[in-house]
Amino acid sequence: MISRRKLVLGLAGAAGAAALSRALAPGLPRDTAARRALKLPIAPSGWPFPGARVVAPAAVFPPGFGVRRIYLDAGHGAPGNTGNVSCFCVEEQEFTLSAARALAERLNATGRFEARVGRTGDRPLPYAERVEDAARWGAEAFVSLHSDVRGRIDTWSPAEGRSCPLSLAAPGFAVLWSDEGNPALGARRLALARAFARRMEEAGLLPYGGAAYSGLYAPDAAQPGVFVDRRPQDQRIFVLRRPSMPSILIETHHALDAREATRWTEPATLDAFAAAAAAALADALGGEG
C-alpha cells in the first residue's frame, strides 16, 4: 500500500518529482507505484498536476439563441448502481450529484440556459425515468456526468484507517456518444460530443487517449477525447441511445487518480468546466433551429 506522504510528493508536479526522487534514493524504501508516478507523461497543459492552469472558454451565442433547456444527468444513483469508488473512497453517485449541481448553478447564472439536475439524491432513480423526464420537460440536450476508472489498480491510505483504490496511469476526460438509431439524431450527438471535448481541451483539461477502451469505445478521428459506443448491442449505454434529444456522457476524470480527483473538487476547475459546457452548448445548439 502507498502511504499518503509518498503520494502527496508525487502530486506536486516538478517539485514533487524532485522530492520523490530524493525519497527514493538508494537505501530508502522503494515503492513501485510511487516510482511509476515519476514516469507519467505530462501533457503540455500540465494537467492534472496542481500547478496546471485552467481557463474559461468564451461562449459565442448567435442571435436568437434564447434560453435553452439542458437536462443534467448525475450518473449512477440508479437502483443497485452506485458507480465506482474513488481514490478517496467517495462513491461515484455522490461525486456526480455534486458536479451536476455545480454545473447547473453556473449554467443558469449565464441567463442563456435553464439547466435541471434530474436526480435529487432522495431515492434511486432508474435511467428510463430520467430519459422520460427529460423528454416531458422539453430538454434540448441530455448531458450525463460520470467519472471513470482505468488501468492497473493499487491501494493507498488517504487517511488513517482507510484503504482506497489508486491508479495514476490514465488521467483525462472522455466524451461518449452513440451512432445508433436515426442518422440525423446521431449527427447531432456527434456535434455535441465534439463541441464538449474541444471546449474542455481549450479549458486546459486533458483528453484521455483511450488505451483502456479497446473493444468498448472507438476514438473519433477528428477530435481527441471523443469516443463512440462499440459495446455489444445489448450492453450499450442507455442514456446515449434512448433520449429523443442529443445526448452525451462525459467521463469527467479518472476517479482513481488522486491528482485529478483533487482538481475536480476545486472551484476553479468547476468554473472552467462550466464555461466549457456553456461554450460547447452554444456551439452545438446555436446552429440548430
What are these regions (language model features)?
Residues 1-289:
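Catalytic-site microenvironment of enzymes
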